[in-house]
Amino acid sequence: MIEAKDKGCQTIVEATPLGLGRDLEVLVECSKKSGINIITCTGAWDGANVRGKNVPKAIRESTIDEITAVWTKEFEEGIDDTGIKPGYIKLALGDEGEIFPLQEKILRAAARTSKKTGKVIQCHIWEASSLPKAVQIIEEEQLPYDRFIWVHADGQMDMDKILEFGKKGIWLEFDTLGGAVDFTKYPQAIRKLQEEKLLSQLLFGQDSGSYWIKEDEE
């Protein structure tokens, strides 16, 4: 991080929610020692086909309104007794081509929290076929499209869906460049977004921040 600071990095958007290893003490220490601002999040992560494994029990057993109340309180008062407030809502869902009930619940809670707080939803959706259902849900919750970021929009590079939902107003995040073997699809996609006047909705990130421990290390 110090090296990143020296190269001009000022802020890191840190996307680890509760249940996936969020550690505020570590984030505070890293921020102080590096001089980089770190934006933490609230939310829940149910990607990678793990069926709720990384979603805390309290969220799994709570109603939409109960989850909304907890997340809203974190934005208004801070997380637990730390005084640290998250900057956005992080979700992961839909990696099996459909959105399961738990995933729908956290998405609706996120939409309601966003409406109360004005905070954006950063939503991991690798399987592009799940996006229409996710957008339908936020439409039912009457959430403005520009409060929703489609993380891994470049995962399958489904240009039909990228253009369709980009035109609705959602944010499009390209973040798999770090592990890409073929880079030719990126300039082609970016050129198409430019032609459709959607470049202002394109975000770039690096999806390389996770460390998955082995079963025998848990």
Predicted regions and their residues:
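Active-site gating/metal-coordination segments in enzymes
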Residues: 29-32, 37-120, 171, 176-180
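Glycine-rich, N-terminal phosphate-binding loop and its surrounding beta-alpha-beta segment
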Residues: 2-25
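Short acidic/polar active-site loop segments enriched in Thr and Asp
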Residues: 10, 87, 200
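Histidine/acidic-residue-rich catalytic or RNA/ligand-binding cores of hydrolases
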Residues: 24, 49-52, 130-137, 158-166, ...
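Short acidic/histidine-rich active-site segments
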Residues: 122, 175-176, 199-217
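Active-site core of metal-dependent hydrolases
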Residues: 116-184
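Active-site beta-loop-alpha junctions enriched in small/polar residues
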Residues: 17-18, 43-47, 94, 126-128, ...
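Acidic (Asp/Glu)-rich catalytic clusters
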Residues: 2-6, 27-35, 75-84, 112-115, ...
